[in-house]
Regions:
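N-terminal intrinsically disordered, cationic/polar leader segments
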Residues: 2-27, 31-147
Length: 147
């Protein structure tokens, strides 16, 4: 299983198989963009993001002591909100601040007929959590979802 976005200049995402679980990975010119793309990959692991309308906005505040833990907190918060609100999101905006981030996600209530759900994440696995910056300054953020 591999599902990828077209690689754009400022960001891209992919969904990949990780044993019986699914991994999501975001790439960007900034950590914020990589986190946005990883969240978009989370949506793509569940449904076609293009089928999700941007009717409602949900705001997030996340804090952690490292980039990897911040990614886990961020993706975990998105998973929790998707579940609690029975929503899918198709657009994300992340802004870093000190040891955390603020974010917005745009989406709509779940419509199982139109959204054609494929997988449902219950959380983040301990393995596979990584946030890194390469020598050219590009960021990658990845985690493995418990399915």
């Amino acid at each position: 299983m591999a599902n990828k976005s077209p690689h754009h200049k400022d960001g891209a995402w992919e969904v990949f198989a990780h044993g019986t679980d699914i991994g999501v990975r975001g790439f960007g010119l900034s950590r914020d963009r990589a986190f946005e793309e990883a969240a978009y990959a989370l949506t793509a692991a569940r449904a076609d993001p293009e089928s999700v309308r941007q009717h409602d906005i949900v705001e997030f505040v996340c804090n952690a002591t490292s980039d990897a833990l911040l990614l886990r907190e961020w993706i975990g918060a998105v998973i929790r909100e998707m579940s609690a609100r029975q929503m899918l999101f198709s657009r994300y905006a992340v802004t870093s601040r000190n040891h955390g981030l603020t974010a917005r996600a745009w989406g709509e209530p779940l419509d199982e007929d139109r959204h054609r759900l494929t997988a449902r994440a219950s959380g983040i696995a301990e393995a596979g959590l990584e946030v890194a910056r390469d020598t050219e300054g590009n960021w990658m953020a990845q985690c493995v979802l418990d399915i």
